[in-house]
């Protein structure tokens, strides 16, 4: 059996944030959510989150995670003290305990799996993850033989000059035999500079300790401040971009674009500079996005082009052109072959196949049929000050420039709305509707004061 415990009780003072450190966002998910996800493939029998600082807020944020047990550490008195809190709740448990840190979000699932499998095959009481760092300053040094058996872990401040030449460091991630760990946890001492109980001290107390060296040191980067958060964001973004480039996506300027792990791209997609993807996005084959574009929780079909625009919580069909400077807001549904032009906003509206809104328009709470042509400056006036109302425009209808459709109103099929009209009543199919003041011209007006 396997239990996974995530240490998430720390305050994160150096973040200088009202938000607990483990709830800081990284590529669309919190740090601790990423840590939990990294161990998901192991299918542990128990998952425990050790909480402390703002425990209630952390629990509320993660209440959607099925089967997650919360264990309170109060006060926060070190990593060893944190794991001591598991003693009563894991009484009678038989198996391994994997200990992860809630602020180390870049661990790959394959690395964690290798740690657990290596621990099981070695017969060790504890196996710890290690990394060789170019600059190990501040990290505890791990001393081990060529077979991987650990003899000692010495904190940086306690190392001699010779010992500091060893760049094999402790990543703070462990796989224990729970029964062996449970015996030594009560023996931990706080006789150290910080007056805390260190989980590291259990390694020397257990008969057999092994280590597994991680191939990529970036995996064990911890986050204590905003700079480190940004560095980890950069590593994760590069992983995502590399993956999708290997899958047939072109990033013209990769470093200027950001993704979420819930993005899905078809083949031969081209992403121009300064284009960003948030949340769950689906992009069809042969689409071209950007530059200067945001796609947020949206679904785009094949051969879609979006230029310098925002598409948020919207659905876009095949062969659609959007932008520049268009804004598709939540519940916009744009059909096959549509055109959304410059300075157009669409909200909670559907556009049938082939419809066009080319310039300077607001389409809100509306249903447009197929092959509708919306003239420049057309507005659906959907709000009466209290409630929103719907505008319906039938197939093959067109509105003249600078028209206002005052909802609720229904425009039939094959209707023409004259330019400059304000339409307040329904218009039957095949009609021409003009609702504007009659033009009046007064000759010699300029001479009136002479």
From Swiss-Prot:
Residues of the active site: 359 (proton acceptor)
Region of interest (Pyrophosphorylase), ranges: 1-226
HAMAP family: GlmU
Role, per record: Catalyzes the last two sequential reactions in the de novo biosynthetic pathway for UDP-N-acetylglucosamine (UDP-GlcNAc). The C-terminal domain catalyzes the transfer of acetyl group from acetyl coenzyme A to glucosamine-1-phosphate (GlcN-1-P) to produce N-acetylglucosamine-1-phosphate (GlcNAc-1-P), which is converted into UDP-GlcNAc by the transfer of uridine 5-monophosphate (from uridine 5-triphosphate), a reaction catalyzed by the N-terminal domain.
Enzyme Commission number, as recorded: 2.7.7.23, 2.3.1.157
Keyword Cell wall biogenesis/degradation: yes
Keywords recorded for this protein, A-Z: Acyltransferase, Cell shape, Cell wall biogenesis/degradation, Cytoplasm, Magnesium, Metal-binding, Multifunctional enzyme, Nucleotidyltransferase, Peptidoglycan synthesis, Repeat, Transferase
GO molecular function: glucosamine-1-phosphate N-acetyltransferase activity; magnesium ion binding; structural constituent of carboxysome shell; UDP-N-acetylglucosamine diphosphorylase activity
UniProt-listed SUPFAM superfamilies: Nucleotide-diphospho-sugar transferases, Trimeric LpxA-like enzymes
Similarity comment text for this entry: In the N-terminal section; belongs to the N-acetylglucosamine-1-phosphate uridyltransferase family.
Cross-referenced InterPro entries: Bifunctional_GlmU (IPR005882), GlmU-like (IPR050065), GlmU_C_LbH (IPR038009), Hexapep (IPR001451), MobA-like_NTP_Trfase (IPR025877), Nucleotide-diphossugar_trans (IPR029044), Trimer_LpxA-like_sf (IPR011004)
Gene Ontology terms: biological process: cell morphogenesis; cell wall organization; lipid A biosynthetic process; peptidoglycan biosynthetic process; regulation of cell shape; UDP-N-acetylglucosamine biosynthetic process
Keyword Acyltransferase: yes
GO (cellular component) term, any one: cytoplasm
Residues the record lists as binding Mg(2+): 103, 224
Group of enzyme by EC: transferase
Annotated UDP-N-acetyl-alpha-D-glucosamine binding sites: 7-10, 21, 73, 78-79, 140, 155, 170, 224, 329, 347, 362, 373
Pathway it works in: Nucleotide-sugar biosynthesis; UDP-N-acetyl-alpha-D-glucosamine biosynthesis; N-acetyl-alpha-D-glucosamine 1-phosphate from alpha-D-glucosamine 6-phosphate (route II): step 2/2; Nucleotide-sugar biosynthesis; UDP-N-acetyl-alpha-D-glucosamine biosynthesis; UDP-N-acetyl-alpha-D-glucosamine from N-acetyl-alpha-D-glucosamine 1-phosphate: step 1/1; Bacterial outer membrane biogenesis; LPS lipid A biosynthesis
NCBIfam families recorded: glmU, PRK14360.1
Location of the region described as Linker in the Swiss-Prot/TrEMBL record: 227-247
Name of the molecule in the record: Bifunctional protein GlmU
UniProt catalytic activity: alpha-D-glucosamine 1-phosphate + acetyl-CoA = N-acetyl-alpha-D-glucosamine 1-phosphate + CoA + H(+); N-acetyl-alpha-D-glucosamine 1-phosphate + UTP + H(+) = UDP-N-acetyl-alpha-D-glucosamine + diphosphate
